């Protein structure tokens, strides 16, 4: 009963939760705990937030045995809201604005809009199936046959 089990239980509970799930990354979401945020109908990020399964410092320590290369690791990991949105990993970016009041208004408006879209789902089973399929698409890849350049 450790961190791995806690993350797995969180993933399991979210995938079965019979209510809309919206995750918002507000700062730095990193390591295995951040993975649990991915099992949501919508994953959103504040414009300056970071989201990854490993911290840049941890990545640099593992890959290059040099934690001082964390800026290089961050670039390599593509952990910004803009990067993740372009990859289809998150559904939206919330602009932070210039004041906390503006940020709160932007978050409230975004949540209202996202909940309205989710409320338009025909039934809970459809929403759960879409949530499951969305989570299963994360990390989908193709292997390219180098000789023929055809997908294998």
Give residue spans per PLM region.
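Conserved catalytic cores of soluble enzyme domains
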Residues: 1-112, 116, 120
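C-terminal alpha-helix plus adjacent terminal tail
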Residues: 114-152
């Amino acid at each position: 009963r450790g961190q791995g089990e806690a993350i797995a239980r969180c993933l399991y509970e979210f995938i079965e939760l019979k209510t809309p799930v919206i995750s918002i990354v507000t700062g730095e979401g990193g390591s295995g705990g951040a993975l649990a945020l991915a099992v949501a109908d919508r994953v959103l990020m504040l414009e300056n937030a970071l989201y990854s399964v490993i911290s840049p410092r941890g990545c640099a320590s593992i890959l290059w045995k040099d934690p001082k290369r964390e800026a290089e690791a961050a670039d390599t990991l593509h952990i910004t809201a803009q990067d993740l949105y372009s990859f289809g990993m998150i559904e939206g970016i919330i602009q932070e604005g210039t004041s906390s009041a503006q940020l709160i208004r932007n978050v409230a408006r975004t949540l209202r809009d996202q909940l309205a879209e989710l409320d338009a789902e025909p039934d809970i089973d459809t929403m759960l199936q879409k949530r499951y399929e969305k989570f299963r698409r994360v990390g989908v890849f193709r292997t390219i046959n180098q000789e023929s350049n055809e997908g294998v």
